[in-house]
Regions:
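Second RecA-like catalytic domain
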Residues: 1-246, 250
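A positional "C-terminalness" feature that preferentially activates on distal terminal regions of long
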Residues: 109-127, 132-134, 150-153, 244, ...
C-alpha cells in the first residue's frame, strides 16, 4: 500500500511539474509579444512594464506569483526606475511638462514601433563588439555542423550554429532565449556567453569532451547598422563609382557654371566587420562582409574624401 501511495505521489508531482512548466512558457510567450520577439531585453522590459501597472492596482504580489517573477527583484527595479527619473529631472533642464509627466509616471507605457527600433539600435551600439552571425550567412566552416535535414527553411534555432566575434568555435542560441523557438535570425548582438557543464565526468587520463557555448541576452540587428555604430571595428573596400549615376559629370558641369565650389561623386563601399582585431578576429582576420552602402565623396586638395 505504501509503495502504491509513493507511486501515486510521484505521478502527481510529475503532473504538477508538467503543468507548472506549461504555465511558465505560456507566461514567457505573453511577454515575448513586445517588439515581435526581436530582443530578449524586450521580454524583461515587458515584465517591468506589466509589473508597474499591476503595482498601481495593488496586485503586484499576485502578478509575481502567476508569472514566475521574483517579487523582491521587481520591487528593487521599481525603486531604481524612480531614482533614475529623479536623476534625469535634476540634471536635464528645459524638459517640457509632458516629458516631466512621463518621467514622474510610475506606470511604464509600452514603446511604439519607432521606439522599438531605436532601442534595438541602442542595444547594438552597446554591444557592437559582441556581434554574432549565423554561420551559413558568412560561409563559415561552422555551418557544416548544422543538421542536414534543416535545409534552407529553419523553423527554430535549435542546433543552428553561429559564429561570434571574440568567441572561438561554433556558438548556439540558449534555450531560454525568445529566439529559440523562432526561425533563426541572421545577425545578433549578445550580452552573455554561457558554457555548458559536461554531462559525464571524465577520468584523469581521459580528454574532456568539448563543451557547448551558448549566447544569451540577444537582440536582432540590421547588419547595415554595424559600419556606422562600430566604425573602428570595420575595414572598408576601395570605393567604386555608383553604376548608373552621372553625379560626377553633373558636378563638373555645375562647377564650370559657377553653381558649385567643389567636385562631388556618388560611390559604393563594402565594409567588413571584425577583421581588424588582433585577437579573435572574425573569419581568420578577414572580417565578415556587411551590406554595401552608398556614400558621397568630395574632391578636397586633389583627394576624394567621404562627405560626413
Amino acid at each position: 500500500l505504501a509503495l502504491k501511495m509513493t507511486a501515486e505521489n510521484q505521478a502527481q508531482a510529475k503532473e504538477l511539474r508538467r503543468a507548472m512548466r506549461s504555465a511558465y512558457f505560456k507566461a514567457l510567450q505573453v511577454f515575448d509579444a513586445l517588439g515581435d520577439g526581436q530582443s530578449d531585453v524586450f521580454r524583461l522590459l515587458s515584465v517591468v512594464g506589466a509589473y508597474s501597472h499591476e503595482a498601481l492596482r495593488g496586485s503586484s504580489v499576485a502578478f509575481c506569483r502567476d508569472n514566475f517573477v521574483r517579487q523582491k527583484a521587481m520591487e528593487e527595479i521599481h525603486k531604481l526606475r524612480a531614482q533614475l527619473s529623479n536623476v534625469v529631472q535634476a540634471n536635464l533642464s528645459g524638459l517640457s511638462e509632458r516629458q516631466l509627466r512621463q518621467l514622474q509616471n510610475p506606470s511604464l507605457p509600452a514603446p511604439n514601433a519607432v521606439q522599438i527600433k531605436v532601442l534595438r539600435q541602442l542595444l547594438a551600439s552597446i554591444y557592437i563588439d559582441r556581434v554574432a552571425v549565423r554561420a551559413d550567412i558568412v560561409g563559415a566552416p561552422e555551418a557544416e555542423l548544422a543538421p542536414a535535414a534543416q535545409g534552407t527553411k529553419m523553423a527554430s534555432t535549435r542546433r543552428v550554429p553561429y559564429v561570434a566575434l571574440g568567441v572561438p568555435g561554433p556558438v548556439y542560441i540558449h534555450t531560454s532565449s525568445t529566439f529559440y523557438h523562432r526561425p533563426p535570425p541572421e545577425w545578433l548582438v549578445f550580452g552573455e556567453v554561457y558554457q555548458s557543464a559536461p554531462k559525464d565526468a571524465s577520468l584523469d587520463n581521459e580528454e574532456e569532451k568539448p563543451r557547448t557555448i551558448f549566447l544569451k541576452m540577444l537582440t536582432k540587428i540590421n547588419p547595415a547598422w554595424i559600419h556606422t555604430l562600430g566604425r573602428s571595428l570595420c575595414t572598408f573596400s576601395q570605393t567604386t563609382e555608383e553604376p548608373g549615376t552621372s553625379a560626377l559629370s553633373d558636378s563638373i558641369k555645375a562647377l564650370k557654371r559657377g553653381e558649385r565650389s567643389s567636385l562631388q561623386r556618388h560611390v559604393v563601399i563594402t565594409p567588413r566587420y571584425g577583421g581588424s582585431l588582433q585577437d579573435g578576429g572574425a573569419a581568420g582576420g578577414q572580417g565578415w562582409e556587411l551590406p554595401a552602402f552608398s556614400a558621397k565623396q568630395v574632391l578636397v586638395n586633389g583627394r576624394w574624401s567621404l562627405q560626413t
